[in-house]
């Protein structure tokens, strides 16, 4: 099946994600190889080895060894698949920075943009579904966002994007054993078991936006029209800022297409998400590891403030405020 539209998928990989990145790359490989015809899909990755925020525990491994391991994994997983991969070392570089620049660069080159994420597994049907969706809606709604379904979330506001087989399950705080739970680490075979049995897509339209950044899809016309991540978002909350920009500029007139019965896995509490970080313990979960760094909560709070005060007269914080304030 030949794809009729052009795509770009971009992912920032932090050096400490080295032990889990192979899973994302394998899912990406599966999605590319699932296409049985011509396809124009630009794969973009940034490998961030800057240590201004987190430092490598050199008693365990060196940055050179991490870099060698990363590029070996990329070559193994993507094999003959074309990709662009570049390394950042000199400056602090966050998910907000990467996604902003990815949008700016590729919106002029492709029809559809997708945000990859190092702790995600994308469905192998991804690009066929998105190609058919874009071809179906581009004449009447050339500006849109889209989202595959996700696991059981913590409150009812997420119901519109929960997978149809997950949404009637209970949310159990801290649960790592049940397959529908937020903290459960799902593998590719488990994801495929849900997606491969789908015979007819359940695509729903919502205008009260609900998404996170993991796997967010947007038509390039959305970015060309001025929706992007503001530079005031220097750390996190970039997905929320993008959503607020979308609401502010278009007042809910741009649809969000939710592919309700196709699961995109977000292993947000992956047990290997933060490896070899100096000062963190193997027993730390993702949140616990981050909070061992004095700067983290301050940067998170300041980025949160910037996100929710974009449209009023309020101070914009930067990394300088985090370290010197």
What residue ranges belong to the model's regions?
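A conserved hydrophobic helix/loop-capping motif in glycosyltransferases and polysaccharide synthases
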Residues: 7-24, 31, 48-50, 149-150
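Catalytic phosphate/metal-binding cores of nucleic-acid and nucleotide-processing enzymes, i.e., regions
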Residues: 14-24, 86-87, 96-98, 126
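Short, acidic, metal-binding catalytic loop of nucleotide-sugar glycosyltransferases
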Residues: 23-41
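Active-site-proximal specificity loops/subdomain of glycosyltransferases
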Residues: 52-110
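Conserved catalytic core of nucleotide-sugar-dependent glycosyltransferases
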Residues: 103, 123-227
